[in-house]
């Protein structure tokens, strides 16, 4: 059984993320979407919220499971018996960071491969950061996220902590 892990902060889950999940779920028997704790990134949504959002967006994929994780990706990959780490590459600017991470992951997990997927054309420019900024400033994010994510954003923005 081919198992892959698609890790990320998913703050929030965008249509670009879902596009990669859809395509990766057609390649692997099981895809585990790993929602990272990522305290250094100071996420807009809590880990629990990001897991809930991802499960709402991805719940219709029978071979996709969403789990949160803290700590090293290598431990999460091992825990899930995955043989592949799936990563998205939007632009050349993503490549250097992702290339370095893939090298480190290969060092830590010599028997696990990193597979890069490029987004479909309409999602190449979408990032969680852009979506959050547009939403906070009152802009329309409906083309970038699913309606359930729009609701999560609106609720979070209307109730600042």
Curated annotation (Swiss-Prot):
Residues that hold ATP according to the record: 9-10, 17, 88-90, 98, 123-129
InterPro entries: Cyt_trans-like, PPAT, Rossmann-like_a/b/a_fold
Annotated positions for site Transition state stabilizer: 17
Function field: Reversibly transfers an adenylyl group from ATP to 4'-phosphopantetheine, yielding dephospho-CoA (dPCoA) and pyrophosphate.
EC category name: transferase
The entry's keywords: ATP-binding, Coenzyme A biosynthesis, Cytoplasm, Magnesium, Nucleotide-binding, Nucleotidyltransferase, Transferase
Membrane-spanning ranges: none
Protein's gene: coaD
EC number: 2.7.7.3
Cellular compartment(s): Cytoplasm
Quaternary organization: Homohexamer.
Pfam families: CTP_transf_like
Catalytic activity: (R)-4'-phosphopantetheine + ATP + H(+) = 3'-dephospho-CoA + diphosphate
Pathway(s) it belongs to: Cofactor biosynthesis; coenzyme A biosynthesis; CoA from (R)-pantothenate: step 4/5
GO molecular function ontology, one term from the record: ATP binding
Entry-linked NCBIfam families: coaD_prev_kdtB, cyt_tran_rel
GO cellular component: cytoplasm
GO BP: any one term: coenzyme A biosynthetic process
Positions bound to substrate: 9, 41, 73, 87
Protein name: Phosphopantetheine adenylyltransferase
Co-factor(s): Mg(2+)
Family from the record: Belongs to the bacterial CoaD family.
């Amino acid at each position: 059984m081919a198992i892959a892990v698609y890790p990320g902060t998913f703050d929030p889950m965008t249509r670009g993320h879902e596009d990669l999940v859809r395509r990766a779920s057609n390649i692997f028997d099981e895809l585990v979407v790993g929602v990272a704790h990522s305290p250094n990134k100071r996420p807009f949504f809590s880990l629990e919220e990001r897991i809930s959002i991802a499960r709402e967006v991805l719940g219709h994929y029978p071979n996709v499971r969403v789990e949160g994780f803290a700590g090293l990706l290598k431990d999460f990959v091992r825990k899930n018996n995955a043989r592949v780490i799936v990563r998205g590459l939007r632009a050349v600017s993503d490549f250097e960071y992702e290339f370095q991470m893939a090298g480190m992951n290969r060092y830590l997990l010599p028997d696990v491969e990193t597979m890069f997927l490029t987004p479909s054309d309409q999602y190449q420019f979408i990032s969680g950061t852009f979506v959050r900024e547009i939403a906070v400033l009152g802009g329309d994010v409906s083309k970038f996220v699913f309606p359930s994510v729009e609701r999560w954003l609106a609720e979070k923005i209307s109730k600042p902590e």
